[in-house]
Design a protein with these regions (language model features):
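Juxtadomain coupling helices with adjacent low-complexity linkers
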Residues: 2-26, 34, 148-192
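GAF sensory/regulatory domain recognition
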Residues: 57-80
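Regulatory sensory and allosteric helical modules in signal-transduction proteins
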Residues: 72-122
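Sensory-domain boundary capping and coupling elements
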Residues: 135-150
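The N-cap/first-turn positions of alpha helices
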Residues: 194-198
Length: 237
């Protein structure tokens, strides 16, 4: 039984994808520097017919102002404008509630509560975009965002684009983790021996008075160390 033309096209498309996948996995395994990762991402961004990309990691600490690290090929004018207007605070792409979707297309609905950001992005030539999310082993959130200056739909189907972005963000961050790049490493939080003891008993649900009795210190000393730890966590006091 012969295959119909469209069946042949589907088979060829699948073969091309898995060939690309094998090539990419091999390439990422051979990377020896962060620059290798960043250059490959730009190359793949253009192959997918986008213009710019941003690789971002949002760490879970400090709790009230989580550390955000990124590498971007966006125009410097846009990066400066974004920072000057503190768009980080309203960017829906970075909101944890959107992370569960995994694959996020940029559209009017997504930016409905961040209209100034959406208007400014388009004014700077960023008219279409997509973001792929990934949870890292240290509970940090990884984001790979691609954008283009053209408002037209890209030639690549959304399901294929999603599969490729899943691989790109996963392998990129895996390489950076292997290299122990600062972008993916959890911010260091150093505690004294006494602070560690108090933190452990606090996690057990003990009150300041109970911890004071257990450690044979005053309750004021316990409260003093707890306030110091709150500052390190950047948590509200």
């Amino acid at each position: 039984m012969s295959l119909a033309p469209w069946d042949i096209a589907i088979c060829m498309h699948d073969i091309e994808f898995f060939t690309w996948r094998r090539t990419m996995l091999s390439r990422f395994q051979e990377m020896a520097s962060a620059e290798d990762v960043f250059q490959e991402l730009q190359f793949q961004t253009q192959k997918l017919e986008f213009d710019y990309y941003s690789l971002c990691v949002r760490h879970p600490v400090p709790f009230t102002r989580p550390k955000v690290a990124y590498y971007s090929t966006y125009p410097e004018a846009w990066v400066s404008y974004y920072q000057q207007h503190n768009f980080l605070a309203i960017d829906p792409v970075l909101k944890p509630e959107n992370f569960s979707q995994g694959h996020l297309l940029w559209d009017d609905a997504l930016f409905s509560e961040a209209q100034p950001l959406w208007d400014a992005a388009r004014a700077h030539g960023l008219r279409r975009g997509v973001t792929q999310y990934l949870m890292l082993s240290n509970r940090a959130l990884g984001f790979l965002s691609l954008s283009r200056m053209s408002a037209r739909e890209g030639p690549i189907a959304h399901d294929e684009l999603e599969l490729k972005l899943q691989l790109l963000v996963r392998e990129s961050l895996n390489v950076l983790a292997r290299l122990q790049h600062e972008m993916v490493m959890t911010p260091a939080m150093r505690f004294s021996k006494r602070e560690t003891e108090i933190l452990r008993w606090t996690a057990e649900g003990k009150t300041s008075a109970e911890i004071a009795m257990i450690l044979s210190i005053s309750e004021n000393t316990v409260n003093f160390h707890q306030k110091n730890m709150q500052k390190k966590f950047n948590a509200p006091q």
